[in-house]
Amino acid sequence: MLDLPNYAIAEIIHQGPKIDVCRGVRQSDRVPVVIKLLKEQYPDLADIAKLRHEYQLVSSLNLGGVVRAYSMEKYRNGLALILEAFGHESLRENLARQVPPLGTFLNIAIQLADTLGQLHSHRVIHKDLKPSNVIIDIHTGQVKITDFGISSMLAREEHGGTNPQHLQGTLAYISPEQTGRMSRSLDYRTDFYSLGVMFYELLSGQRPFDTQDPIELVHCHLAKNPRSLTQLVPGIPPVLRDIVHRLLAKNAEDRYQNAFGLKADLEQCRQQLTERGQIEAFEIGRHDRSGQLRIAQKLYGREQAVKNLLASFERVQHGDEQGQIEIVLVTGQSGIGKSSLVNQIQIPVTQARSYFIAGKADQLKRDIPYAPIRQSFESLVEQLLTEKTAQLEQWRAKILAALGNSAQAIIEVIPKLALILGTQPPVPDLPPTEAQNRFIRLFAELIQVFARRDHPLVLFLDDLQWADLASLELLSRLTTSQARAHVLLIGAYRDNEVAPGHPLLSTLNAIAAQGYSPVELAVTPLSSDTVLTLMSDAMPESDSRALRSLANLLHQKTQGNPFFVAQMLKTLYDEEQLQFDFNQGIWRWDLDRIQTVGITDLNLIDLIVSNLKKLAPQTQTLLKIAACIGTRFDLQTLAPIVDQSPLSLAQSLMPALQQSMVLPLNFELQTTLSLTEEDWQNASASSTHWVYRFLHDRIHQAAYSLVEPVERADIHARLGHLMLQSTPKERRSEVIFDIVNQLNAGIAIARTLIEPATLADLNLQAAAKAKRAA
């Protein structure tokens, strides 16, 4: 039996792969408790973090609708979380016996909406709402929410596409954006979708999507509408059906925006049922006011451009059996919405059972051959790794059949492909031109494996104005090849940064000379009316005339750049120039005062820099160093530069996360602050590679601009030196470009850290690899 000092454990009520949940008694005062134990002898750091995070978060809330946390105890080499022994069973167990009557459902639903509203008021996103995480007292009908191990206190998060088996939350209940397949960040409204799934199940006895296949379930959340509750429960009041389906909207903007607005609608349903015995129709959402500035993650004024992109995809999808390659060039200045436009077609592409992959050129990594190509195809590998073993083996066979004994030439550029193919024999060295021809031929063969008529491939390459020469040459040769592939190639670039003689223009001219005519989509600034629409969605409770005046001012100052508009609105809100009057239920501002304080006189970079300078000095320092790494960075690279632990760095970066200047790319970051240095030292750190990215290139650029030239050279040199020291020789080839780029960016200082002969040899190794790749 499990042994925990001062606790008598009566029974194990749940056994998971990593956690046991028990009922017991605290012996010091005979208080009944529920105990969550980390069962492994040496728990993983991420599991320790989750348990500590849950304890610290729940114990700080003190909410009646949340199962209380009493204490955290040491248990072997891990931890035990001591919880309130509330209720008798979970809603899952309760639902297994019967679907609750309508009145009982409303009582449960109102309590859950109220508790969720309180959680969101405390900036907590639960992220794993489901019947088994709701405990009910069957005598009183009271319900409480439990299990906050993956809950977040960030305004927004980014979840990249990952194996459905490894997603945060429970797959049957997670929102479309929580699957990581929507190219949008996640916020508190993910909980409304999960609540909608629960309500649907409580009313009908069925989940909206009951498939057991993980990939199919992700597809359902993204692309399929559930059967109407009216079909499953013929007598359900239409207004209650509408409430549930509003919660289940695919886009967060179309759901409820405030849990108390949801609660008000549910209370009106209960009142009618109590007083009249039935629920009649009424307008839902009348009290759905968040009081927060919430800029929608959707496109404005780009409807025709989206249609044009989809038309290109359909031409590729239904093209000639011999294959069809179509190029779309999306142009426009930074922040104008090029990436957002292209990402709009990701769901339709997924619905068509096709692959959407994306890579992004990095201004600081322009010398790395095939960098955006590698990034995009590594994301494809990650998608393939989510498939079943049998399907993955089929892909392996197809790829090897296409590449033959030369697969290693592709693995040199796309190392993650080895996760599917395994170790491959080396390929013979060839002169540079022949090596390049071999690679391009093999790459065309690889593309043909995935780019079939029944599942075309959409390849999106962003920021082509920074693309390396090898990638540009590959694109030119690919489009004029005889590859029998169905590919939609979308390239986005800042046309105002591409002057005559730029390599990208040379590539496009070469493609045109072959008789190839790309589709061109110019993304232009928003009109003043569209800016007004954006602001109306962000602040719906506003005086229309006053909002028009403010919209005109922001349109004039930002020249209709949507990212600039959003940054300006956020800054005005943070500076309390925009305030919500809860008494009157309306947004208020003083236009004259806004013009006086000077915020609207800043250009985009200056505005971002001013916001960066409001952060604590230590946070600013970390962002400056991170900017020298690139648009993405990780704590393990930063830590030795500043001589701090990753845990300390994560704590210092939290203000930047809370301001949405950087975003975490893997969920372990959400629980990092709960760890202790002892946890870090004692636990297995197998899953502690914590990665961030700057929200936008302009934020990265602003942070980089804060670094003085002399300091910049020093940081680059030290980064390169530390990367060299920390990389085993047998793995140095994998990161040789990153090492050399950093050292060369701080070459004067690098020469004081590394022997000149060593520095020359590293550059020679990088050049040799570049030749092999190119």
Where are these regions (language model features)?
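C-terminal lobe helix-coil module of Hanks-type protein kinase domains
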Residues: 172-275, 559
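AlphaC helix of the eukaryotic protein kinase fold
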Residues: 42-60
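Protein kinase catalytic-loop region centered on the HRD/HxD motif
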Residues: 114-124
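Conserved Walker-type P-loop NTP-binding/catalytic site
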Residues: 371-458, 506-517, 529-536, 544, ...
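Activation segment signature within eukaryotic-like protein kinase domains
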Residues: 108-109
